[in-house]
Structures are given as C-alpha cells and as structure tokens.
C-alpha cells in the first residue's frame, strides 16, 4: 500500500480488501483521480456540466409549514431538483468524466432504488459511453419507472437474482464483472463505500452539496445552521452534505439510518448503531452480521437504504463522535413522505423521508431558536406506486 497517493483509511475503517487482480485497477483509478483534481481543464469541464447540464446550484428552500415548532426553521437542500432527480448525478458526472480521461469505453454500475442507475445512464448517454447496470431483482420489481428510464437512455439493466436480490447482491455482481473487464471498463460505484479510493472519490464529487449549503446559509441567515441532517444507506448524500461542515464544530452532523420494522427486529438496515466491524465489499466497516459472522440481510422500505454496511468515513465520524447517527422506521418515513407533500407541495424520495422524519422529531423537542438543514437527496416519483400500495393496504 506504500505506493498509494491517498490515505485508504478513515481511522480504523476503509482499506482495499479486494482480490489481487483488482489492486492495479484501483491504484490506476487513484492516480487518475489525483491527477484530475489538479487539472484545471478537468475541473472546469466538471463544473460546467454541474451548472449547465445538471442544474446547479440547487435551491435551499425554507419550509413554510413543516416545522412543528415556531422556534425552529427547517431548510431543505433541494437535490431533488437536480437533473436525474437525485444527488447521484453529481458524482456520476465526475466519475464518468474521469473514466473518459482514463480511456475507458464502458461503464459498469450497481443500483438499488435506481437513482444511481438513472444518473449513470444519463451520464453515459451524454458522454458516449457503453452502460451496464446491475440491479437486484426485487428492486427491479419495485422500481419499474427507473428501470424504464435507464433502458430508454440506452443502458443494459441486468437483474440479479442471487442472495437477497437487492443492492448488496448487485454490488457483488458489478464488482465481479469489473474484475474481468477493468482494462476497458470503469466501475462507477454509486455510494461513498467500497474499496479505496471510491469513498474519497465519491465524497469529493459530492462535496458541492455542503459547499453550496454553507454559502446559501450565510447569505440567507448570516450564520451556519445548528445541524445538517441526511439519510444514510451507503452514505454518499450524507457525506456530500457533511464534508464541508466537518471542521465547523458549531454544526451538528446527523445521519439517519433506516430502522425498517423496528431496531429491535431483524428487519432494519442500521449497521452503524447495531452492526459489528467486518470486511465487506472491499472495505473494513460496520456490518450487519449474525452470531457466526455471516452477513445478515438488511431491510428498508426504501431500496436505496437497503444496504447491510456503510461508508468508512461515516463509521469514523460515528466512532469519534463528530457525527451522530439516529434512525427512522418505515412508518415514520411514510408519515414524513405524506407530511412534506401536504405541507410543502414537495414529494420526497422515501430515502430522504427518513431524514425529514428525524428533523421534524428533533424540531419538536428544541427549546431555543434553531436552524436545521435537511438534505432532500431525491424526489419521490419513483416511490409513488410503492407508497400507494401500502396506503391501500397491499403487501409490498
């Protein structure tokens, strides 16, 4: 590892736990990323795409009716307004540009809710790259609008039936494919997890979320928020929001994991609070495991949070106490999904609804003037059929 240019660890978490065949590919990727970060032409092209293709900066919206407490302002960082419908587009454009810079012709990706797959498909269509997306068969069934969008933009969507047929299995299949094709293909990982250098690359390409939020808050309120809140699955939208605030001790960083049917049941996806450290997906990180060390299946109503591990920087922020991690159940997320629609005319992704749920709960308990910012990581179009079925009493 002495030849690496960046630290592969966040405290004890992270690393590059991959088959030897992939080590040269990861080192090549790290070198290309470091060089691109120092290349003014690359940075200018990335910035131009974010502004003139994706639609940045995104709005910072002060909610009018959501807060249950007159002393508490709740702002929404509107990543739902980004082209593609979620924060995923930020880092996908960055990685796709990086892949072209490296001379790759093909992109391999995994997706859960389909948002990363859609973002990858649009970036590949734009930049003339072949696109292959692995998606758990369960997620293909519950996210049909996004599957159609991907195929419409020219992507090949491959349903994965192994294991639990969800995101972790799609990740494994994508990594397996890449191990045999990395000379021509780039694995465009969709979250701030996996082997080094992916957690660092994804954070840096998502950092724009927190940078804009900080600038917008200073313009609007003349000060920084008291807390920033984001949902956490793998953790890319949250680390994008947190990154520029980590060195601002007055700003509390709050991640919200999916409590599913309840933290006291096996049906959740909260490895930070209820997992044990292990090796998974090329990294050392908190992991949902049984008593024999086998990976337990995670569960969440939201496909994008249905992941049994979490990014290593979140694990480190949790271990050091710089960030705190809470959870919201399916029922709480469903209530927040409906509440935001009724109160503000904004339909959030079910993933983002977990963060909304916690923000409303926190606001209710505040006893002084407080400003909260929630990262509204995506829009809820993809979830309306799932929510409709649940509200109509159907099993999902």
UniProtKB/Swiss-Prot annotation:
Q: Name one GO cellular component term.
A: cytoplasm
Task: Report the EC code(s) recorded for this entry.
Answer: 4.2.1.20
| Molecular-function GO terms, alphabetical | tryptophan synthase activity
Provide the alphabetized UniProt keywords: Amino-acid biosynthesis, Aromatic amino acid biosynthesis, Lyase, Pyridoxal phosphate, Tryptophan biosynthesis
Highest taxon of the lineage? Bacteria
Listed cofactors: pyridoxal 5'-phosphate
Matches recorded under Pfam families? PALP
Q: In which pathway does it act?
A: Amino-acid biosynthesis; L-tryptophan biosynthesis; L-tryptophan from chorismate: step 5/5
The UniProt entry, under Gene3D superfamilies, shows: 3.40.50.1100
Location of N6-(pyridoxal phosphate)lysine modifications: 88
- SUPFAM superfamilies in the cross-refs: Tryptophan synthase beta subunit-like PLP-dependent enzymes
Recorded catalytic activity of this chain's protein: (1S,2R)-1-C-(indol-3-yl)glycerol 3-phosphate + L-serine = D-glyceraldehyde 3-phosphate + L-tryptophan + H2O
Q: Which family does it belong to?
A: Belongs to the TrpB family.
Family matches, as HAMAP family: Trp_synth_beta
Q: How does it assemble?
A: Tetramer of two alpha and two beta chains.
Physiological role: The beta subunit is responsible for the synthesis of L-tryptophan from indole and L-serine.
What is the name attached to this protein's record? Tryptophan synthase beta chain
Q: Which organism is it from?
A: Shewanella putrefaciens (strain CN-32 / ATCC BAA-453)
Q: What is the lineage of its organism?
A: Bacteria, Pseudomonadati, Pseudomonadota, Gammaproteobacteria, Alteromonadales
């Amino acid at each position: 590892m002495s030849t690496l240019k960046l630290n592969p660890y966040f405290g004890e978490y992270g690393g590059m736990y991959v088959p030897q065949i992939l080590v040269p590919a990861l080192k090549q990727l790290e070198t290309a990323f470091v060089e691109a970060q120092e290349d003014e032409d690359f940075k200018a092209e990335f910035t131009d795409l974010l502004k003139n293709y994706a639609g940045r900066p995104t709005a910072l919206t002060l909610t009018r009716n959501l807060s249950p407490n007159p002393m508490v302002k709740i702002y929404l960082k509107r990543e739902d307004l980004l082209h593609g419908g979620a924060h995923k587009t930020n880092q996908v454009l960055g990685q796709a540009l990086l892949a072209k810079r490296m001379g790759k012709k093909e992109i391999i990706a995994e997706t859960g809710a389909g948002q990363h797959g859609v973002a990858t498909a649009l970036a590949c269509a734009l930049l003339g790259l072949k696109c292959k997306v692995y998606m758990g068969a369960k997620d293909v069934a519950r996210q049909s609008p996004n599957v159609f969008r991907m195929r419409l933009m020219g992507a090949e969507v491959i349903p994965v039936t192994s294991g639990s047929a969800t995101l972790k299995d799609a990740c494994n299949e994508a990594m397996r494919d890449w191990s045999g094709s990395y000379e021509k293909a780039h694995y465009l990982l969709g979250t701030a997890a996996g082997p080094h250098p992916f957690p660092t690359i994804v954070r840096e390409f998502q950092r724009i979320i927190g940078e804009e939020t900080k600038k917008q808050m200073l313009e609007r309120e003349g000060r920084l928020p008291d807390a920033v809140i984001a949902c956490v699955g793998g953790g890319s939208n949250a680390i994008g929001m947190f990154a520029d605030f980590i060195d601002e001790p007055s700003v509390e960083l709050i991640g919200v994991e999916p409590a599913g049917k309840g933290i006291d049941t096996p049906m959740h996806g909260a490895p930070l609070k209820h997992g044990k450290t292990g090796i998974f997906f090329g990294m050392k990180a908190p992991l949902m495991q049984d008593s024999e060390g086998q990976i337990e299946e995670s569960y969440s109503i939201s496909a994008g949070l249905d992941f049994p591990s979490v990014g290593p920087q979140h694990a480190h922020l949790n271990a050091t106490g710089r960030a705190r991690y809470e959870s919201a159940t399916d029922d709480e997320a469903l209530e927040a999904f409906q509440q935001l629609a009724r109160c503000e005319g904004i339909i959030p992704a079910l993933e983002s609804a977990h963060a909304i749920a916690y923000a409303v709960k926190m606001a209710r308990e505040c006893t002084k003037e407080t400003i909260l910012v929630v990262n509204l990581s995506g829009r809820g179009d993809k979830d309306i059929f799932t929510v409709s079925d649940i509200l109509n009493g159907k099993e999902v």
